[in-house]
């Protein structure tokens, strides 16, 4: 039996995935989590084989949660399930150790296939994402997105700033001092050649880092 943990900040998505997988032989959804922080707690408690991880969530987000989870539980297989099809997200998640990357537009059959493949030690990447990554490997090495210049931590903090989270809130969630958060903030501004949170938000929307309709 493959034990699955479903991580998404939207209750309808978590419930929908759980119900879809309930009737699949050989799979058991052992729990749900609505944030990156909770996913780490549930991973310790429930010891899932496979984690279906959303990327954009409040708090530390799917990227940082994946990195921390695999550091503590290297045997867990993480599959990103997200609307984020454009780089840098696929590349960043796979570099962080995710075993799979698929879009929320995938059907039940594809999701089950992904779970079984990664459990067996293979990787699964949705065809459209795989094609995009393959084409990118043949392109000249240029920074298509200014966010490619940022480290994982800088992207994490940038997205939290765009999400209107205050410095103290970011500090508390990431266990960093407010001074350190501000240092990251100014470094992000410098790398992106911007000077305000508003410019950061506009740049994030323009390059697909956030959903403009959200």
Swiss-Prot record:
Give the classification, highest ranks.
Bacteria, Pseudomonadati, Pseudomonadota, Gammaproteobacteria, Pseudomonadales
What is an annotated GO biological process for this record, any one? regulation of DNA-templated transcription
> Which part of the chain engages DNA, per the record?
167-186
Q: Which residues form the Response regulatory domain?
A: 3-119
This chain's protein is named: Response regulator GacA
Q: How is it modified after translation?
A: Phosphorylated by LemA.
HTH luxR-type domain location, by residue?
143-208
Q: What does this protein do?
A: Forms part of a two-component regulatory system GacA/GacA(LemA). May be involved in lesion formation, swarming and in the production of extracellular protease, syringomycin and N-acyl-L-homoserine lactone (acyl-HSL).
| Keyword annotations from UniProtKB, A to Z | Activator, DNA-binding, Phosphoprotein, Transcription, Transcription regulation, Two-component regulatory system
The entry lists its GO molecular-function terms as: DNA binding
List residues, modification 4-aspartylphosphate. 54
